[in-house]
Amino acid sequence: MAVLLVALCVFQTRSAQSSSATTSQAVPKPLLLEKNEGERRIWREPPPGDFILKVSPINNGSQHLVMGTEDITPGDEFPTHKHLGQDEIIYIEKGAVRVHLGDQERDLHAGGTVFIPAYTWVSVKNAGTEAVSVVFVFSAPGFENYMRCDSVLPNEKVTPLSPQEQKACGREGHVIYKDFEDNPKK
């Protein structure tokens, strides 16, 4: 967890130093959240699953970081994709995952960390028999827009997106899925 906190500080400092002057941004509000608190959302595509966005421009005005949590059921995965302009850290809280990162492949367990530089292909699969819990942190806002686009709130009806809508979500969230053109996500 110390690695995650250090990375958060580094990302925030680097983002603050490298960002150009912006006009009248909202001041981020501090948050204290329990494990299940935040913006809970349900993925549109099978297999069903949910995630919680905790820190984002919409949730608390954060201009430099996005953070959330997600559980991955056995056999499920984050398909091969890359983020355009955002680094990401995934911290494995519980369980075991198989990670393909660039030209590397490795199994990681609870306490493991994945650092994903922007523009690097990555996939993460639950390689075990129990649910995996992860914490994800992005160095800049953007991908949470994709996550919202491809999900619904718990009280909303889950409806699938067309391939064109999926592509639009990807553009909005600064992400490219490896097989997106021929084979939309999931």
Specify the residue positions occupied by each region the protein language model found.
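Bacterial N-terminal signal peptides
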Residues: 2-9
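A short, N-terminal "cap"/entry segment at the start of jelly-roll beta-barrel domains
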Residues: 11-65, 152-186
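Conserved short histidine dyad/triad with adjacent acidic residue
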Residues: 51-53, 68-83
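Ligand-binding loop in jelly-roll beta-barrel domains
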Residues: 61, 98, 118-145
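Extracytoplasmic
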Residues: 64-67, 87
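Glycine- and acidic-residue-biased ligand/ion/polar-headgroup-sensing regions
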Residues: 85-97, 102
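Short acidic-glycine-tyrosine-enriched beta hairpin
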Residues: 103-119
